[in-house]
Amino acid sequence: MKKLALSFCAVTVMTISGCASFADMAGADSATLNAQSAQSFAKMTQEARAKNQLDTSSSTYQRINSVFLRLKPYADQLNQTGQRFDWQLAVLKSDSVNAYVAPGGKVVFYTGIVNKLNLSNDEIAAIMGHEMTHALEEHAKSKIGAQALTNLAIGIGTSYAGTNIGDLGNAAINLGSQIGIGLPYSRNLESRADYGGLMLMAKAGYNPNAAISLWEKMNRLDGARGASFLSTHPSNTQRIGDMRKNLPAAMAVYNKRR
């Protein structure tokens, strides 16, 4: 019976689609997420400014901001969310090699990712395009929907098995939820953002080859990453390989701009 419950849970997770729609039903609609994101972003920037961690004037900031402003109109052209994005950028003084985006177009860059990797403007555009694609495709919303579906399926499976399935049974269900939908779906979102970012930077006139040189730099920084199967991101090597496959299409867009 326990095995049947685990199987039932896995099938339930894998056959339910429409994670973004499920997020809407769970109360995480686009307008609400974007509003919450705007509030959090404003609070974060206020706190960073108070701690003198918000960069608004350095040469690194100016380079990041120039790329942001150049990509923004092309990102707006691709916005099919039904919500107008109030794109905003925060550059934080930090050695961290990181950048991220919040719903509704709130982009955060750390100075460390530019300075430590000695990025060109084209390489900055590769990161910026990647993050903007996450926002445009509402990947945060999709992840919320996916997690809600996972929790629903786990609940169904646990209920079907009975309340005394034991620690081993619970551990198996949790592992199944990770492998069945959580991590692979997240890697899929990252791959979609890589592709979308490649095309977005090309539309704005940045050389898509820079996306490959960016991840080659990341590879050297990270060292050997090992297998990507249980990683939330594709391995750097896998990323580079996928980008090489998508490069001809991106270069065709880029060359039309020249």
Predicted regions and their residues:
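Hydrophobic helical h-region of N-terminal Sec-dependent signal peptides
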Residues: 9-13
